[in-house]
Amino acid sequence: MQVILLDKIAKLGGLGDQVSVKAGYARNYLIPQGKAVMATKANIETFDARRAELEAKLAAGKAAAEERAAKLGELAAVVIASKSGDEGKLFGSIGTRDVAEAITAAGVAVAKSEVRMGNVLRNTGDYEVVVQLHADVKATVQIQVVAL
């Protein structure tokens, strides 16, 4: 199925690219999320008329993400306290939701979906967590897990 992208999508393309994707991906994700429209003649003409408006909207979103990244860069280490055993092993784990809540409590609003972690944190110590604020903007935050 041919679609026109209205946003930059990782591993697919940028604004205005006409790409071929599987029908289910287009119908169930791209089109309902407002990230693409079907590539019909009418939609192509409409897109060409709105291209400048969409590019300005995309640039504004990236500028806002860069501003948030600068605020995240200014943060000192974010401390998360959790119950742990004698050897520093946590009772439970710290996941993306816990990290997002701690960063938000520190003063910069971050959604759970923006936090990128390989695994959950299961021990006390210092960690670096990547926060993906935009397709092109990433920030690294220092997380310090301490025992209660």
Swiss-Prot record:
GO CC terms, sorted: ribonucleoprotein complex; ribosome
GO biological process: translation
InterPro entries: Ribosomal_bL9, Ribosomal_bL9/RNase_H1_N, Ribosomal_bL9_bac/chp, Ribosomal_bL9_C, Ribosomal_bL9_C_sf, Ribosomal_bL9_N, Ribosomal_bL9_N_sf
One Pfam family linked to the record: Ribosomal_L9_C
Record key words, sorted: Ribonucleoprotein, Ribosomal protein, RNA-binding, rRNA-binding
Top-level division of the source organism's lineage: Bacteria
GO molecular function terms listed in the Swiss-Prot or TrEMBL record: rRNA binding; structural constituent of ribosome
Gene3D superfamilies linked to this entry: Ribosomal protein L9, C-terminal domain (3.10.430.100), Ribosomal protein L9, N-terminal domain (3.40.5.10)
Function description: Binds to the 23S rRNA.
NCBIfam families noted in UniProt: L9
PANTHER family hit by this protein: 50S RIBOSOMAL PROTEIN L9 (PTHR21368)
Family: Belongs to the bacterial ribosomal protein bL9 family.
Protein name (Swiss-Prot/TrEMBL): Large ribosomal subunit protein bL9
Organism: Aeromonas hydrophila subsp. hydrophila (strain ATCC 7966 / DSM 30187 / BCRC 13018 / CCUG 14551 / JCM 1027 / KCTC 2358 / NCIMB 9240 / NCTC 8049)
Lineage: Bacteria, Pseudomonadati, Pseudomonadota, Gammaproteobacteria, Aeromonadales
